[in-house]
């Protein structure tokens, strides 16, 4: 899985599953067309819409040094009725 890092399971994303919308974090350098092409090819589904937004990394401190985690992009993928994506693995914390 080149573009998709992991599926997102929040209260909102679980609600969106009822509307045939799937939420996942993807690599920040990926474009919408790359992700759409990859999802259609890998899962054999038809994508009708994609929404994306970039999320800033969180601030982290290691002793006196301030740093931050990497920025990332989140995609909400809407599929045509009748198609579904099997559950993706959850990120380990």
Curated annotation (Swiss-Prot):
Matching Gene3D superfamilies: 3.30.70.330
Pfam short name (any one): Ribosomal_L23
Keyword tags: Chloroplast, Plastid, Ribonucleoprotein, Ribosomal protein, RNA-binding, rRNA-binding
Compartments, as annotated in UniProt: Plastid, Chloroplast
One Gene Ontology cellular component annotation held by this UniProt entry: ribonucleoprotein complex
Tagged with keyword rRNA-binding: yes
Source organism superkingdom: Eukaryota
Biological process (GO), any one: translation
PROSITE patterns: RIBOSOMAL_L23 (PS00050)
InterPro entries to which the protein is assigned, alphabetical: Nucleotide-bd_a/b_plait_sf, Ribosomal_uL23-like, Ribosomal_uL23/eL15/eS24_sf, Ribosomal_uL23_CS
Described purpose of this protein according to its UniProt entry: Binds to 23S rRNA.
Family classification: Belongs to the universal ribosomal protein uL23 family.
Subunit structure: Part of the 50S ribosomal subunit.
Protein name (database record): Large ribosomal subunit protein uL23cz/uL23cy
Organism: Lactuca sativa
């Amino acid at each position: 899985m080149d573009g998709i890092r992991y599926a997102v399971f929040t209260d909102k994303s679980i609600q969106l599953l009822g509307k045939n919308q799937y939420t996942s974090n993807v690599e920040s350098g990926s474009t919408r067309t790359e992700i759409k092409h990859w999802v259609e090819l890998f899962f054999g589904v038809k994508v009708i819409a994609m929404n994306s937004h970039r999320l800033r990394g969180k601030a982290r401190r290691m002793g006196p040094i301030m740093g931050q985690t990497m920025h990332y992009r989140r995609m909400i993928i809407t599929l045509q009725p009748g198609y579904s994506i099997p559950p993706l693995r959850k990120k380990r914390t």
